[in-house]
């Protein structure tokens, strides 16, 4: 068999040919005329590195490198994509933007927890209440920034879920143990609490609108829970996180509106005659200490949504030139500015209106107890209806991690995406399981202090630890000491607030009435 001839080295003319267009010559100059005397010999370059003047449009290798560089800058950091992510509701759609991020963060960050902040002020007073709320707000805003930055901290990897980031920082097994329970509660537990609050608020709305005309055969509380759950299941059929951006916008608008209405209506009415702004005192010093810890736990519980930050950011496209953390942080700044405009007026205005007479149920309970006959029924009914809309919208975003987990288990076993019927079945199942837990544990929404302590590390502690373990700042530097100290301070507060929440349950005589919701 004949041997293949060696590849010849083709010579490149030193100057462009006469027919070369002007646009192909350097700086668009006309091609120089050929020499009048014919060249006696043709010079062939013997080096693979051509002089710059020999290649007006660049060598083929240079063009390939330039094109490849541009492609990588547009596509990203050579991120290794998991094919399964294209089948899951959190990462199925990656066309999010800063507006979607603002909608989702507002929907997740403003909710029923803010309505009980004046209860904490009743135990802390003016100075300590405002100071504690301000410190907690700044602290959680910083840890939010940490999570946004850690989403793509390792080149070639996007941490699309909170548990994934915890596993990368703490290790596979320890990360699951530390992050799974609080994130599951903040997802499934919040969904259950939303069913309880949404159902009870629908019942109050019905009573206000109908008045004495509808007292013959009203629905029970459990039946209102079922009505609210059915509405949640219908809305949960939207396929992925980006598809509920419209619902998040509705939830954000309604949450801001009813938060403003609640404190404005409270401040505009005459204050109770026996109002006092002295912090509530307990018979013993230890009792007062635990009451303060429980109040701080209520403040910590008011800041929610950090378990969804990475999930929201994973819905955005990310490239080397346009990383996802830029629009995510832009949307987060807008949303948390609006969140501050909600929680601070509620806390200060609510405590000013009711003082230490604030009932444990929060602002809605205070409005209903003190001003049911003073405020026009239309305004009161509107406020309650907005709370229902906000709870319906919040249920969708807090349930999305649970939907994602169900579908991840299915797709990993079958190696195919969920069909419409399977996806709908998972969401119906989750909705009715949440309803069942709400009926079985009707006291769940009254454990704000305890639950705030148990879930506090997700917001205030773990992000600081993960920053040190992933970014690896210089040991014993200020950055190293600051994040370790802030993280361990969050863990200490978590233990203290949990103890305060348990003490509050014991002192107030919380009756664990299983399967006995209020009538």
UniProtKB/Swiss-Prot annotation:
Keywords: Amino-acid transport, Cell membrane, Membrane, Transmembrane, Transmembrane helix, Transport. It is a multi-pass membrane protein. Pfam families: Aa_trans. Its main location: membrane. The keyword Transmembrane helix applies. Residues 198-217, 265-282, 355-377, 449, 507-519 are extracellular. It comes from the Eukaryota. One of its GO terms (biological process) is amino acid transport. It is found in: Cell membrane. Residues 1-44 are annotated as: Disordered. GO terms for cellular component: plasma membrane. The chain crosses the membrane at residues 115-135, 136-156, 177-197, 218-238, 244-264, 283-303, 334-354, 378-398, 428-448, 450-470, 486-506. Residues 1-114, 157-176, 239-243, 304-333, 399-427, 471-485 are cytoplasmic. Belongs to the amino acid/polyamine transporter 2 family. Amino acid/auxin permease (AAAP) (TC 2.A.18.2) subfamily. Amino acid transporter. This is Lysine histidine transporter-like 8.
């Amino acid at each position: 068999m004949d041997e293949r001839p060696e590849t010849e080295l083709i010579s490149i003319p030193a100057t462009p040919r006469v027919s070369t267009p002007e646009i192909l010559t350097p700086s668009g100059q006309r091609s120089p005329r050929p020499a009048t005397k014919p060249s006696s010999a043709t010079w062939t370059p013997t080096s693979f590195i051509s002089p710059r003047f020999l290649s007006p449009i660049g060598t083929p290798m240079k063009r390939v490198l330039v094109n490849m560089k541009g492609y990588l800058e547009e596509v990203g950091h050579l991120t290794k994509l998991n094919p399964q992510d294209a089948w899951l509701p959190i990462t199925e759609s990656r066309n999010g933007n800063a507006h979607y991020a603002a909608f989702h963060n507002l929907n997740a960050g403003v909710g029923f927890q803010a309505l009980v902040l004046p209860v904490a002020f009743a135990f802390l007073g003016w100075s300590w209440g405002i100071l504690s709320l301000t410190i907690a707000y700044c602290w959680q805003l910083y840890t939010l920034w940490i999570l946004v930055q850690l989403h793509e901290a390792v080149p070639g990897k996007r941490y699309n879920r909170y548990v994934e980031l915890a596993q990368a920082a703490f290790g596979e097994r320890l990360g699951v143990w530390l992050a799974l329970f609080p994130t599951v509660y903040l997802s499934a537990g919040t969904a259950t609490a939303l069913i309880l609050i949404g159902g009870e608020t629908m019942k109050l709305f019905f009573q206000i609108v109908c008045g004495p005309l509808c007292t013959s055969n009203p629905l029970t509380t459990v039946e209102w829970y079922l009505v609210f759950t059915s509405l949640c299941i219908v809305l949960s059929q939207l396929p992925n996180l980006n598809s509920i951006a419209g619902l998040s916008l509705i939830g954000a608008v309604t949450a801001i509106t009813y938060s403003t209405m609640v404190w404005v209506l409270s401040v505009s009415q005459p204050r109770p005659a026996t109002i006092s702004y002295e912090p509530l005192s307990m018979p013993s010093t230890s009792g007062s200490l635990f009451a303060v810890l429980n109040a701080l736990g209520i403040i910590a519980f008011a800041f929610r949504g950090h378990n969804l930050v990475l999930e929201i950011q994973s819905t955005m496209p990310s490239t080397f030139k346009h990383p996802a953390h830029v629009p995510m942080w832009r949307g987060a700044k807008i949303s948390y500015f609006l969140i501050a405009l909600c929680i601070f007026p509620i806390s200060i205005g609510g405590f000013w209106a009711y003082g230490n007479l604030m009932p444990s149920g929060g602002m809605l309970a205070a409005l209903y107890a003190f001003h049911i006959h003073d405020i026009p029924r239309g305004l009161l009914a509107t406020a309650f209806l907005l709370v229902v809309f906000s709870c319906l919208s919040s249920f969708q975003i807090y349930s999305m991690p649970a939907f994602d987990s169900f579908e991840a288990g299915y797709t990993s076993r079958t190696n195919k995406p969920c069909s419409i019927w399977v996806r709908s079945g998972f969401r119906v199942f989750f909705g009715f399981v949440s309803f069942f837990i709400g009926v079985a544990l009707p006291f769940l929404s009254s454990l704000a202090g305890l639950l705030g302590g148990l879930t506090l590390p997700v917001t205030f502690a773990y992000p600081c630890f993960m920053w040190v373990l992933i970014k690896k700042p210089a040991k014993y530097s200020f950055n190293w000491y600051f994040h370790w100290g802030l993280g361990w301070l969050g863990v200490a507060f978590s233990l203290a607030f949990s103890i305060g929440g348990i003490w509050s349950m014991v002192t107030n005589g919380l009756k664990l009435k299983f399967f006995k919701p209020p009538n």
